[in-house]
Amino acid sequence: MLLSKYFLPILKEEPSEAKVISHKLMLRSGMIMKQAAGLYTWLPLGLKVLKNIENVVRSNMNKVGALEVLMPCIQPAHLWIESGRFEHYGKEMLKFQDRHDNTLLFGPTNEDMITDIFRRNIKSYKDLPKNLYHIQWKFRDEIRPRFGVMRGREFLMKDAYSFDINQKNAVNTYNKMYKAYMNTFRDLGVFAIPVIADNGPIGGNLSHEFHIVAETGESTIYYDKRFKILKDNPDIDVEEIKGWYAAAEEKHDVNKLSSFPEGITRSKGIEVGHIFYIGSKYSVNMNALINDEYGKLIPVEMSSYGIGISRLAAAIIEANCDKKGIIWPCSVAPFKVSLINLNIHDNKCVELAAKTDKELSHQNIEVLYDDTDARPGSKFATHDLIGSPYQIIIGPKKAANNIVELKDRKTGVLEDIEVENIINYIKNIDSI
């Protein structure tokens, strides 16, 4: 992709309304543009990141046998009335009437609708288990939307819902999804801690939140240092992991502790996922019954699994940035390589840049080729800001000797490489 043809509205000045680093960098790098309080347009660069996060999430859901569906963002209110949740959400839920005076709502979540889909189609234990997920925009009318897409009113979520014959099987499915979430965050290039949580308005009695560790996080979390090994070893047995949590009754006032218990780490975290074992709350309220092996009608056991995809875009930035800008993990980067031609009037620079761009593209490595006439300092600032994991820099002096520079955005290390070797060099970088 030629930068001269791309739509990248870079902001030179730091936006005054932005309070957290992710919001500042998303606005400055041309990822998003504010339309109203808590509402943003995702511009080309930001949308590429969003799609890449979606693909990582989708891949891990498919690996555990979850099936993708797409439910409407507008839901009939009668389902929420039937489940008993219609009044609970209060003013956060956007409600309205259609021309026939039917009450509708912009869905903040989908437990009620997925239960309706299940009860109308599945009647026997022989059709279980089932695990359905969708990726859809949601709306909650936050009283004080803030922090950009981190706490917006409109947001993109992945919601999954599992259905099992009994509690034992439901917990087994829950554990598989727990591991799928750990794999997802590993593939996204972030370190996430699973925290025992309250089920809140969803209901149920087993729940975990997943927090990305970031210095700018809103939440303070305390966790066993053994959780750090999950980043590279996500296949550890879930039952073993459960032994790392404190007992439910083991609570401490951190202000009264003279020192932390041995092996406990304190960090800031950003919640990006939440999973719940719901049980039969919705199936009882909405009459989602199945015939068991003895022909008896019983309520199906359910669990719910959410990941905030648009929130993840901001959280990943919070955990991967420096004073110059974003440092994208390769798996979600909008472009894997920034190809920077320092002199578009030098024939050798143009020749090497065009050749490198073509060959990288043939290897399905996404490249943003800076063919603009901007000054070198301006080009470096732009590409450090947008955060491509690698920069290939082509200047007249080294180009004359068929040499290009490769910069690792994360480490800042520069390396001279002969141009005929650059493609293989890039291909051999594991994270690309």
Curated annotation (Swiss-Prot):
GO terms for cellular component: cytosol. InterPro entries: aa-tRNA-synt_IIb, aa-tRNA-synth_II, aa-tRNA-synth_II/BPL/LPL, Anticodon-bd, Anticodon-bd_dom_sf, Pro-tRNA-ligase_IIa, Pro-tRNA-synth_IIa_bac-type, Pro-tRNA_synthetase. It catalyses: tRNA(Pro) + L-proline + ATP = L-prolyl-tRNA(Pro) + AMP + diphosphate. One of its GO terms (molecular function) is ATP binding. Signal peptide: none annotated. It comes from the Bacteria. The keyword Protein biosynthesis applies. GO terms for biological process: prolyl-tRNA aminoacylation. Catalyzes the attachment of proline to tRNA(Pro) in a two-step reaction: proline is first activated by ATP to form Pro-AMP and then transferred to the acceptor end of tRNA(Pro). Homodimer. This is Proline--tRNA ligase. It comes from Rickettsia prowazekii (strain Madrid E).
